[in-house]
Amino acid sequence: MVLQQTEPTDGADRKASDGPLTVTAPVPYAAGPTLRNPFPPIADYGFLSDCETTCLISSAGSVEWLCVPRPDSPSVFGAILDRGAGHFRLGPYGVSVPAARRYLPGSLILETTWQTHTGWLIVRDALVMGPWHDIDTRSRTHRRTPMDWDAEHILLRTVRCVSGTVELVMSCEPAFDYHRVSATWEYSGPAYGEAIARASRNPDSHPTLRLTTNLRIGIEGREARARTRLTEGDNVFVALSWSKHPAPQTYEEAADKMWKTSEAWRQWINVGDFPDHPWRAYLQRSALTLKGLTYSPTGALLAAPTTSLPETPQGERNWDYRYSWIRDSTFALWGLYTLGLDREADDFFSFIADVSGANNGERHPLQVMYGVGGERSLVEEELHHLSGYDNSRPVRIGNGAYNQRQHDIWGTMLDSVYLHAKSREQIPDALWPVLKNQVEEAIKHWKEPDRGIWEVRGEPQHFTSSKIMCWVALDRGSKLAELQGEKSYAQQWRAIAEEIKADVLARGVDKRGVLTQRYGDDALDASLLLAVLTRFLPADDPRIRATVLAIADELTEDGLVLRYRVEETDDGLAGEEGTFTICSFWLVSALVEIGEISRAKHLCERLLSFASPLHLYAEEIEPRTGRHLGNFPQAFTHLALINAVVHVIRAEEEADSSGVFVPANAPM
């Protein structure tokens, strides 16, 4: 990928509105924090998952975010939010910058290569997955149909000295309950190979951590340490476990578990349909990340594995994303479906049947979000004792948006079900009453204001994108009714869909023919790009073209897309925010739809240049520095990347084969 560098001729920053989008050279992703900042750049973290637990590892080899047993449980390592809130480092003594880092291809196994003055080390990290192990007894947590592979609840770290001699150090200092309860260590046997960490208060209320290794563990207060000199050919393993599943006792056993974990991931990714294209690596990494954000026991899908990574440095826009949003989840299924990965949809729809009460004859209204176990109450609170990432307070757990009224969720849900049902030509019987209820909710409430797709904490408004998604609910609902043989519903719902569309076109379009953020106002909003991606209007409609180009030219900073202008939108918060990466990828897809292929490709290339060294994305990007902001990695961004990249690749292929581009049929 060759990118041309452009510089302003007048010495000032040129705005996107001055001309078409330009491709600039990639900027260093770590330009925000300085070397003196004790917090690593957000983009420096690696992401691990076993589809039950997630963790983040810094480039220095330190586990700085781990919540067990669930991703929304209190943290046991939380240094990403406070440097004293727990860590687990394994690496060479005196060296904190690795020679190289990568994921083993097709997996979520992180490999870090270290060079010292005297030798070389290779460290591999994984959350272990193995063959399904609950044979004689049923799992207490799994509600979905058992698969071939399952989490073993072990964080496994292996070390191999490949050249010379290297001094290896290990430091494991958990801090339970978000650093509110310290740890106490004790040996679990007569030798030094295993130790157990428990909470110093109410240990039965917190997980027990077991550290198993072929190193000699020393207990120093709240910390378990080890230090040894390795020579070429030496191998070390360290396993941290928190359940009854046995940890490896030898390096050979550890290596076998690492191989089985890689095999689990590769068997999953092999099912996908990936193009033979230079961007294939971005697609695969995004797909693996989305899979890693699933919670296999229930079928829920996380928005992100972290809480309170700031959208604005030292600002208040810090939120807990460790929950399952209906919107984010259904969009993620769209992205996976685009790549031929369809199995996760079955589990998520079963999760929806659970939380809506369809499986036990009850009827609950669909919420904006749920806990990964289906919890309906996600009360928000602030943890004042934590400094926050890079001193950005407050640190929040829970999310107060769970009881907001957001009218787009019915459309996203019905669209996702239709996307999968039309290829199978059937709807699960238990799901039809749930879907019918969502259509009825859209009919009942579409004329009312809501807080919109961006969950504004200001006053409810008549957001145009919410009305469009209500149209999607009725449009997809009518098509699902036809599949179900309910022709009267199909006819009735089509008529209401047309009523909604007429209302939007009468009240949500300005004098220029541009769709507006809300009724009665000319402000722009990036969510209106969904108007073309959901087929609300055809791509050749002049209002679609005007809207896409207005957003590209007027709602961008250095070519990257904002959600909205904060000075034009009452979102109930102070301060600025970065550009929303999902919106920039939406713009790529929308530009393809209206035939602006070259412009779309250039923007896509630029966005891919902002990826972290491990091809991961946070929620936002600071356009002038490339700094990642917000929770990390974020499902919303990765799903939009998949759709944008596939849009561009399909457009190129069609243009190459016929000389004429036909807009891609977006699944929505």
Swiss-Prot record:
The keyword Membrane does not apply. Its cofactor is Mg(2+); phosphate. SUPFAM superfamilies: Six-hairpin glycosidases. Pathway: Glycan degradation; trehalose degradation; D-glucose from alpha,alpha-trehalose: step 1/1. It holds the Pfam family Glyco_hydro_15. It is an enzyme of class 3 (hydrolase). Its EC number is 3.2.1.28. Optimum pH is 7.1. The trehalase activity drops sharply at pH values of 6.5 and below, as well as at pH values of 8.0 and above. GO terms for biological process: trehalose catabolic process. The keyword Cell cycle does not apply. Keywords: Carbohydrate metabolism, Glycosidase, Hydrolase, Magnesium. Inhibited by pyrophosphate and polyphosphates. Also competitively inhibited by validoxylamine and castanospermine, but not by trehazolin. It comes from the Bacteria. Catalyzes the hydrolysis of alpha,alpha-trehalose into two molecules of D-glucose. Does not hydrolyze maltose, isomaltose, sucrose, cellobiose, p-nitrophenyl-alpha-D-glucopyranoside, and methyl-alpha-D-glucopyranoside. Is also inactive on alpha,beta-trehalose, beta,beta-trehalose, alpha,alpha-trehalose-6,6'-dibehenate, trehalulose, nigerose, and trehalose dimycolate. Homomultimer of 20 or more subunits. This is Trehalase.
